[in-house]
């Protein structure tokens, strides 16, 4: 949590300042899917899979932000999720975080303002899979793990997740 607070302060946020105001996050009407094509290979499950897997693609396909927002956290080479990007959004006045896991490569930086045309990373999950000699124990093939969470969360977000198909 201290790391997150320090990151916000380095971006100019003050104590007790609403993050939507601090980051000047533009309101959007809805989310768009982060891939140009593909299919859902694993559905959302509130108890065991808090997101959807978007597959039917090869590694290195572009992954886009789901809408206007700001990159709030980047995790590199996690043993479960690989390279992960978190983005804060304001959808119709409601705060959300989108989370993009199993990225082969990250193309954005912490604090970067993004929109739906911003390539945030490249689809991964196959070459980074532990079973293929990689570091990610939570994948076995090329896909994007895509999660939407209520409010702004970069840790302990799983309690607040929503099925991305609702958007």
Residues of each region from the PLM?
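Cationic-aromatic interfacial patches
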Residues: 1
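Zn2+-dependent peptidoglycan hydrolase active-site motif and core
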Residues: 65-107, 126-143
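Acidic, glycine-rich catalytic/binding loops that coordinate metals and/or anionic ligands
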Residues: 9, 19-27, 109-115, 136-167
């Amino acid at each position: 949590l201290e790391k997150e607070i320090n990151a916000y302060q380095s971006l100019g946020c003050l104590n007790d300042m609403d993050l939507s105001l601090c980051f000047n996050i533009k309101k959007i009407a809805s989310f768009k899917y982060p891939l140009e094509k593909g299919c859902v290979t694993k559905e959302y499950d509130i108890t065991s899979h808090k997101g959807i897997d978007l597959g039917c693609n090869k590694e290195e396909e572009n992954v886009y932000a789901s809408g206007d927002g700001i990159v709030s956290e980047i995790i590199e080479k996690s043993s479960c999720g690989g390279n992960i990007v978190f983005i804060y959004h304001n959808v119709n006045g409601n705060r959300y975080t989108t989370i993009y896991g199993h990225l082969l490569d990250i193309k954005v930086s912490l604090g970067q303002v993004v929109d739906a045309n911003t390539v945030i990373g490249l689809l991964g999950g196959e070459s980074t899979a532990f079973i293929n000699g990689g570091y990610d124990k939570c994948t076995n093939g090329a896909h994007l793990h895509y999660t939407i969470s209520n409010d702004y969360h970069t840790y302990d977000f799983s309690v607040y997740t929503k099925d991305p198909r609702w958007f």
